[in-house]
Amino acid sequence: MTQLISVNSRSYRLSSAPTIVICVDGCEQEYINQAIQAGQAPFLAELTGFGTVLTGDCVVPSFTNPNNLSIVTGAPPSVHGICGNFFFDQETQEEVLMNDAKYLRAPTILAEMAKAGQLVAVVTAKDKLRNLLGHQLKGICFSAEKADQVNLEEHGVENILARVGMPVPSVYSADLSEFVFAAGLSLLTNERPDFMYLSTTDYVQHKHAPGTPEANAFYAMMDSYFKRYHEQGAIVAITADHGMNAKTDAIGRPNILFLQDLLDAQYGAQRTRVLLPITDPYVVHHGALGSYATVYLRDAVPQRDAIDFLAGIAGVEAVLTRSQACQRFELPEDRIGDLVVLGERLTVLGSAADKHDLSGLTVPLRSHGGVSEQKVPLIFNRKLVGLDSPGRLRNFDIIDLALNHLA
């Protein structure tokens, strides 16, 4: 009899075949299209025949932490609580990184699978995600970033550098993601986990547009690993945490709205607080600039007036109240500001100009965060069954689809 587990009000059938769910960070669908057109992704091209290729929506804000945690909980941020890479903790009155598992409000499917007796493995590119994804997980869990520190007691596996045959990659490199895939292949070949979650970094997508030689080479690398996983009998399910767009004008200059500077000029200093949830320890490739921001208002600043002021700025797509944003994007009310501001497709939002170091932006700015980066792929190496009319699909449906609806 098929064993079921229930997690966050959804049921999952435990698979008898190794299942690999892959989150390709920043995978705007055009990257795949261009790689296929260039003949660089033959395995992905074949999936239109024997697999399933769909499109879904990611969570907004379209950032790494909220979406990875939505995928592994099968639920939106209103359930699991992770609504950014960075947030303002109103209890401590401090701006803090959301990398600690203490901020997680829901169990993960990964941990519950392990409790049910499955061997579960998690490999992330950046170490910032490891504590969140590995929360209460008794299995294998490590990052490529700190692969030289992997040990049996803490990570469930050892000698990973020797097994993979690669040195520890730079966190700002395509090699960081390739290490994830190579480690996944080693685990599949040797330990053969029942379920594996692989999460990459979007360094390449931040630097290189779809169809460029660098982007096509990166997708060719991934395609070769997808094929090898398939040849070893694994169920392969691929999605993304968010898309990616250029955030520049016609000649490649960054389109940045420094909201804190604009609000200070309008209302005075210390009257508002702009918080950018894209902020994380790795800012070189995006300068902590994304298309989503939250704004906290002091008592003397009228909300309606602030909404009208922000909405009138060229490049702003929408301004929502806290309740509107939480309803539309399924966010936790106690962890966002009074207002949510969304940038248009070609525009990013900053705080104050002197708080952003743009020296690392050696190529035209590409970033994410808004609704313009919400469309992501849902790709499987099997046919879907039992979904005559799937309706709106989300990236956090991928584990349900991979375990409950594949032929």
Swiss-Prot record:
**Which residues does the annotation say bind Zn(2+) 2?**
D202, H206, H368
**One MF term in the entry's GO annotations:** metal ion binding
What Enzyme Commission number(s) apply to this enzyme? 3.11.1.2
For activity, the cofactor(s) needed are: Zn(2+)
Keyword Zinc assigned to the entry: answer is: yes
- State how activity varies with temperature: Optimum temperature is 37 degrees Celsius. Activity is rapidly lost after incubation for 30 minutes above 40 degrees Celsius.
Give the source's domain of life in one word: Bacteria
Give the UniProt keywords, A-Z: Hydrolase, Metal-binding, Zinc
Q: Does the keyword Kinase apply?
A: no
What does the Swiss-Prot or TrEMBL cofactor note state? Binds 2 Zn(2+) ions per subunit.
Induction comment: By phosphonoacetate.
* Catalysed transformations (reactions): phosphonoacetate + H2O = acetate + phosphate + H(+)
SUPFAM superfamilies, per database record: Alkaline phosphatase-like
Activity regulation per the record? Completely inhibited by EDTA and 1,10-phenanthroline. Moderately inhibited by the phosphonocarboxylic acids phosphonoformate and 3-phosphonopropionate and the phosphonate herbicide glyphosate. Partially inhibited by the reducing agents sodium sulfide and dithiotheitol and the chelating agent iminodiacetate. Nonphosphonate analogs of phosphonoacetate, such as arsonoacetate, sulfonoacetate and malonate are poor inhibitors. Inorganic phosphate, acetate and the known phosphonotase inhibitor phosphite have little effect on activity.
UniProt xrefs under Pfam families: Phosphodiest
Q: How does activity depend on pH?
A: Optimum pH is approximately 7.8.
Which proteins does it associate with, and in what oligomeric form? Homodimer.
The entry sums up its family as follows:
Belongs to the alkaline phosphatase family. PhnA subfamily.
Function of the protein? Specifically hydrolyzes phosphonoacetate. Does not have activity on other organophosphonates or acetates.
Task: Quote the NCBIfam families the UniProt record gives.
Answer: hydr_PhnA
Q: What is this protein called?
A: Phosphonoacetate hydrolase
Origin organism is: Pseudomonas fluorescens
Whichever gene encodes this chain, its name is phnA
